[in-house]
Amino acid sequence: MTSNNPQPITDNGQLKILHIDSNHPLLKEQLQESGFINHEDFTSSKADVEKKIHEYQGIVIRSRFKIDKAFLDKATNLKFIARVGAGLESIDCEYAASKNIALIAAPEGNRNAVGEHTLALLLSLFNNINKASNEVKSGQWNRESNRGHELDGKTIGIIGYGNMGKSFAKKLRGFEVTVLCHDILENVGDQNAKQVSLEELQQKADVLSLHIPWTPETNNMVNQDFINAFQKPFWFINTARGKNVVTADLVSAIESGKILGAGLDVNEYEKLSFETLTGDMPEPYRYLLNSNKVILTPHIAGWTFESHQCLAQVIVDKIKALYC
């Protein structure tokens, strides 16, 4: 994503870029080779960064802190913000756009990783991989209680058919499944997924995989009413954003059998940085930790060695496309 009106480079032809999160070395190296001036500050507080941000025309971030209105007001010379990741929820995008600051993200950089991880969660759920492995390691040899399900013949529903949703659908091509997608944009369906209304998806899906950003419109979208609108019990996968789901309602649906199992790479209780959970441990989260119907991973769907490099390359290419 970029804004439509990026500002021109500085008079001497060089932009000063502040990197406030560590990333793959190629990002800084290639920008340096292209004539950009690069400074790093991975430890200063937001307040301390605000004191010097006026010196820079560009900033490269992941999710260390929020780029809010107060920060942007101090960034008087900022021309672009590049986030090494897919989402931009840590940035006040509307206010940045009002200041003609270009916004750059890299969903292309980790879409393959997310697609693979989503499929891994689904297959693990269907075949009780985690549960069976833990039992064998503890000396139990339980075959019948770990009898699994096959994907063939199932209908997979994907909500959010952008980079991540399309990647997951592509991974499903080797299975005899029906893939449906729903998106707020029209005409995004392709040879891998048929675009349908939300109502049709809820009527037909055996599996729901979420691939939407976290916005005011999607916040708490997966709640009791949303879940109950599904005609059949279903498996639920979330590799998108945790705050799109009301965890207490998810737990209730698992307990009632409406949701057969959940694979969650993200959860409602993550901090904005995605590096840690919030300090407390609410009861719904305790349930997720103890349920053998739930698989949890720590927001690593897009976190591979390959995507680490690819994300950086996408950001470099997009910055150079605007300013070289």
What do the PLM-derived regions correspond to, one by one?
Residues G13, E33, E144-K232:
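Rossmann-like dinucleotide/phosphate-binding beta-alpha-beta segment
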Residues L72, T76-K79, I91-L103, L210, ...:
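Beta-strand-loop-alpha-helix segment that lines the small-molecule cofactor/substrate pocket
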Residues P233-F236, R241-C324:
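Rossmann-like dinucleotide-binding domain for NAD(H)/NADP(H)
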Residues R64, A86, I212-W214, A240-R241, ...:
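Short glycine-/small-residue-rich Rossmann-like dinucleotide-binding loops
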